[in-house]
Amino acid sequence: MAMNVSTTATTTASFASTSSMNNTAKILLITLFISIVSTVIKLQKRASYKKASKNFPLPPGPTPWPLIGNIPEMIRYRPTFRWIHQLMKDMNTDICLIRFGKTNVVPISCPVIAREILKKHDAVFSNRPKILCAKTMSGGYLTTIVVPYNDQWKKMRKVLTSEIISPARHKWLHDKRAEEADQLVFYINNQYKSNKNVNVRIAARHYGGNVIRKMMFSKRYFGKGMPDGGPGPEEIMHVDAIFTALKYLYGFCISDYLPFLEGLDLDGQEKIVLNANKTIRDLQNPLIEERIQQWRSGERKEMEDLLDVFITLQDSDGKPLLNPDEIKNQIAEIMIATIDNPANAVEWAMGELINQPELLAKATEELDRVVGKDRLVQESDIPNLNYVKACAREAFRLHPVAYFNVPHVAMEDAVIGDYFIPKGSWAILSRYGLGRNPKTWPDPLKYDPERHLNEGEVVLTEHDLRFVTFSTGRRGCVAALLGTTMITMMLARMLQCFTWTPPPNVTRIDLSENIDELTPATPITGFAKPRLAPHLYPTSP
């Protein structure tokens, strides 16, 4: 019996071994087949694009110098974004190709071509450039927005969409945002009580800073703030550093295109970004480190804000999903990405509305009709505030926060708008050019909210890319809901709670642009007078 068992076992083992070998052979054959098919497809694509490169021309553009391309023009004609805009205007084109060093930069101001890139060829243009400023701000590419298309990006984007910026999380954080909407009214009302004008830029930027700090850290201030509800020195440093970093990130730095010059800082941008990044981290990281320790020690057991969510995320083995560096850098990127768009749109919208009282009156009338004058406007009212949202949407169109969107790098050769775009090219959508394109927008320089009104609900997203709000595609902003909420609530509270006029002795708000960025040259300032019953205004911060 023992011999039979042994023989059977030997036979079974032999059969298993043979079966295993057969399976291995099958796997190898399948793998080989897939590899051959993939290679054939790649070769066909390569041949197709080689043919395309012969059949389709490169986009028009200035003649590059040998080796350095159009770097001399980039340096000579600062700010570079205005030179590019004028170049495209002079060439009468909605797409061009400018060579900086070995990099092909492709600005686009046509919505049809923009949709080709972010919709039809979204997968091809999903990469990001590797440059020093992006590497610095992301802690070595640990985040989402500026990170190349790789596994780290996929991991962090999944965290954001499923755990941080989801509709359920948005609802969970409602009360924190509501506190900051009340705080905004408290601050502006105190300016009136002190007979001061309201600097809308300060109010808007620090509302945004307060909201994201409250959602992230459960605190409005790093320090004590000011008695009137305004920002303290720490908050001013924080927000100023964020806007400085944004100004120089993808700011046509010489070393972005001639990387062998990295570290020499020939145009001074590298040092500026490093210092701004240090300021942001010096204020935020101690809070993050303290909270991580509280969870590790068991001192903290309940989630209260987004920082708690980041820290308590677990992988399939029950271990922390994110390490401290990933948490710190992703939080820094969220801070940088949250404040600028809402603040810029509201500042410009308020300037335009104060200068056009008939439009301001229509927005106020809508608020009185939808909300009434017996309570303050709330997030639940947003779907019904079409005119208010149209005012914000028109500010996005006419006065974008940045000249260009974050670059989309081509991961392979492509044909866009009947032009050949080589692999490695940076496609940059011109927010300025798209929103002011006369082929898309009649009378494009006129601020006219009513061009956005239709029979349905007005939304701030713009998937047809006739202008850029939160972009679209796999590299689009994942926080459109939060952005829409912040912008609409900020603008609605300002308009519902106060009557706005130019400051005393001023007949019209100056709406000229800064030379080196797209903010108003002079911060929008107005005189705000309460228009509701006194008991509706918050009396404490």
Curated annotation (Swiss-Prot):
Signal peptide: none annotated. The gene is CYP79D2. It catalyses: L-valine + 2 reduced [NADPH--hemoprotein reductase] + 2 O2 = (E)-2-methylpropanal oxime + 2 oxidized [NADPH--hemoprotein reductase] + CO2 + 3 H2O + 2 H(+); L-valine + reduced [NADPH--hemoprotein reductase] + O2 = N-hydroxy-L-valine + oxidized [NADPH--hemoprotein reductase] + H2O + 2 H(+); N-hydroxy-L-valine + reduced [NADPH--hemoprotein reductase] + O2 = N,N-dihydroxy-L-valine + oxidized [NADPH--hemoprotein reductase] + H2O + H(+); L-isoleucine + 2 reduced [NADPH--hemoprotein reductase] + 2 O2 = (1E,2S)-2-methylbutanal oxime + 2 oxidized [NADPH--hemoprotein reductase] + CO2 + 3 H2O + 2 H(+). GO terms for biological process: cyanogenic glycoside biosynthetic process. The synthesis of cyanogenic glucosides is mainly in the top of the plant and then cyanogenic glucosides are transported basipetal in the plant to the tuber. The chain crosses the membrane at residues 19-41. It comes from Manihot esculenta. Keywords: Endoplasmic reticulum, Glycoprotein, Heme, Iron, Membrane, Metal-binding, Microsome, Monooxygenase, Oxidoreductase, Signal-anchor, Transmembrane, Transmembrane helix. One of its GO terms (molecular function) is valine N-monooxygenase (oxime forming) activity. It is a single-pass type II membrane protein. Residues 1-18 are cytoplasmic. This is Valine N-monooxygenase 2. Its cofactor is heme. One of its GO terms (cellular component) is membrane. Heme binds at residue 477. Its main location: membrane. Glycans are attached at residues 277, 505. Belongs to the cytochrome P450 family. It is found in: Microsome membrane.
